[in-house]
């Protein structure tokens, strides 16, 4: 019954409210992906530093780990593409900021992946 309420409420939302909710949901996913990327970057730095960390078993994240993260970031970008801004500048700016943040995370992921590859 709770799901029915959510569906009914979404029909009563204005396009602007729906857009804000869609962008917020996407950004929530991106927040968790950013945390995951931070963990991968830290693991990469530990392994790249070598020495004590490497002798204690610090290993570089696998290439596939970075690829999966990149795929999920790409999916977040695609979901933002589907968000209808109803032609409102404020909503377009909100979506644009979210897109830029995801693109920056993709670049960070690519850089971390390159560092991990060099450290192997």
Where in the sequence are the language-model features?
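Eukaryotic low-complexity, intrinsically disordered regulatory regions enriched for acidic, serine-
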Residues: 13-120
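Short amphipathic, charge-patterned alpha-helical segments
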Residues: 1-2, 6, 68
């Amino acid at each position: 019954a709770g799901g029915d309420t959510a569906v009914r409420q979404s029909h009563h939302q204005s396009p602007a409210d729906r857009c804000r909710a869609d962008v917020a949901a996407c950004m929530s996913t991106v927040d968790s992906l950013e945390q995951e990327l931070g963990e991968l970057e830290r693991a990469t730095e530990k392994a790249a530093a070598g020495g004590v960390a490497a002798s204690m078993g610090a290993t570089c994240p696998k290439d596939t780990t970075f690829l999966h993260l990149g795929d999920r970031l790409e999916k977040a970008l695609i979901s933002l593409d589907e968000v209808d801004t109803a032609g409102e500048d404020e909503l377009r700016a909100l979506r644009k900021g979210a897109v830029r943040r995801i693109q920056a995370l993709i670049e960070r992921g690519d850089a971390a992946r390159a560092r991990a590859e060099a450290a192997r």
